[in-house]
Regions:
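Catalytic cores of the polymerase beta-like nucleotidyltransferase superfamily
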Residues: 1-434
Length: 434
């Protein structure tokens, strides 16, 4: 679970060349997998690629959303036959198809309404309702902006086109805070009122779609702001109304930023891996993730991060860290969290987190990466044990002894390990033999 890098291009909105020319250069249509001459007359590029092109946020292969006056589904199938790639049906009724080719994704939709302007009026937010009418020759196209999305882009405002548009697909209610965080926009007051008023409608959206939108939010560079917007508006209340979790469930989110991770000694790579999980755990419990059809692995990881955060908060140990927990709990914590331990370290004071992070980076640290000094096969061979619960308990005991320094870290010192193992078996009343 990682965060994407930030784009570095300067916004075209602030540049000197005309917008059309700047957008043409940024989008570089000559590199698209479908040449311009294959596009039917009246084709327009809409949505995120236009918006991000104007903001200087385009990736190497941006997702392209095209609107055509004809059958979008048939067009993607035709291109797949002629150019290769894979055609996917997204919406047969509305004639929306997808072409996946050479690392590119092109979504092609039949124009809704009697004109391109009518189609744009059906969209969610004004900054997503800017179209670039594509030419058939090598000349810049024309921008179509009937809803003044360019003005909102310049002003940094996220404005819903209409209340009814948000309700046409309630996922748009969640997309608003995600876009506001991602683009650094302020949500217009009327738009925010609509989003909050209709938040219960998010429960009508397929859980998989909600989770996909949330994952985009928590992975964003400004994901902490997105999390705070969701919580301030209660947008996930319909999804989090399951069994109550024990302990504090709504921690602050100001620390879930790249800057705060750096204060705790994280590299950017480590922070970009840990922050999304920490943010997701701040939003959702295992019940909600299950309702959204999250994978078992993701649900388990989120459960462990939440459990140990709540445990530390309940015991008042956030300032001290988990080193103040009883030994058995410390061992459970490290066994359960593993690669997600940094997500918990974000909750701790910088000095405590730095020390723990240093130990976590040491893959030979016997507590932060616990393992028995001898494996089960070796113990069976030397002690005449059989597979079963007794062997499992012995392995767990030896793991704990090594984790807390009562056995050497060097796994080659088997004689001491065997002596301790025999002592444990004797205490349990279990004879052993060589």
């Amino acid at each position: 679970m990682h965060m994407p890098p930030d784009p570095t291009d300067d916004p075209i909105l602030a540049s000197d060349p005309p917008l059309d020319q700047g957008l043409w250069a940024a989008l570089a249509p000559e590199s698209w997998p479908v040449p311009l001459w294959m596009l039917p007359p009246g084709t327009a590029l809409v949505g995120g690629a236009v918006r991000d092109g104007l903001l200087g946020r385009l990736g190497e292969r941006p997702d392209l959303d095209l609107v055509v006056t004809g059958d979008g589904l048939a067009l993607t199938q035709e291109w797949a036959q002629r150019l290769g790639g894979t055609a996917v049906t997204l919406d047969r009724e509305r004639s929306i198809g997808r072409l996946v080719l050479d690392g590119w994704t092109l979504d092609v939709a039949r124009q809704q309404g009697g004109s391109l302007e009518a189609d744009l009026h059906r969209r969610d937010y004004t900054i997503n309702a800017i179209a670039w009418l594509l030419p058939l020759d090598a000349a810049p196209g024309a921008l179509v902006d009937p809803l003044h999305g360019l003005e909102d882009l310049r002003d940094g405002v996220l404005r819903a086109i209409a209340e009814a548009n948000l309700l046409d697909d309630p996922l748009r209610l969640l997309r608003g805070p995600r876009l506001a965080a991602e683009l650094g926009c302020t949500i217009a007051p009327q738009s925010w009122e609509w989003i909050v008023t209709h938040r219960a409608r998010l429960k009508t959206v397929a859980g998989e779609r909600v989770l996909a939108e949330l994952m985009r939010l928590v992975r964003g560079a400004e994901g902490a702001r997105g999390v705070e917007l969701l919580r301030r508006g209660g947008l996930l209340e319909a999804w989090t109304a399951g069994p109550a979790t024990s302990g504090p469930s709504r921690p602050a989110t100001a620390h879930l930023t790249l800057e705060e991770a750096r204060r705790r000694g994280f590299t950017d790579t480590e922070a970009n891996a840990a922050l999304p999980m920490a943010r997701l755990a701040a939003l959702l419990d295992e019940h909600a993730l299950g309702a959204m059809h999250a994978s078992k692995a993701l649900r388990r990881r989120c459960r462990h991060v939440r459990r140990w955060r709540q445990r530390l908060m309940a015991l008042g140990l956030i300032e001290q860290g988990f080193g103040a927990l009883p030994e058995d709990e410390q061992l459970d914590l490290h066994n359960q969290l593993g690669e997600d331990l940094p997500a918990l370290l974000l909750e701790l004071p910088p000095s405590v987190a730095r020390a723990a992070l240093s130990r976590w980076r040491d893959l030979d640290d016997p507590l932060f990466h616990p393992q028995s000094p001898m494996d089960g096969l070796a113990l069976q061979r030397h002690l005449g044990l059989s597979p079963g619960p007794r062997l499992g308990s012995l392995l767990a005991y030896l793991m704990a002894e090594r984790a807390f320094g009562r056995l050497p870290r060097d796994p080659r010192l088997d004689s001491q390990t065997l002596r301790v193992a025999r002592g444990w078996l004797a205490d349990k009343g279990d004879p052993c033999h060589d």
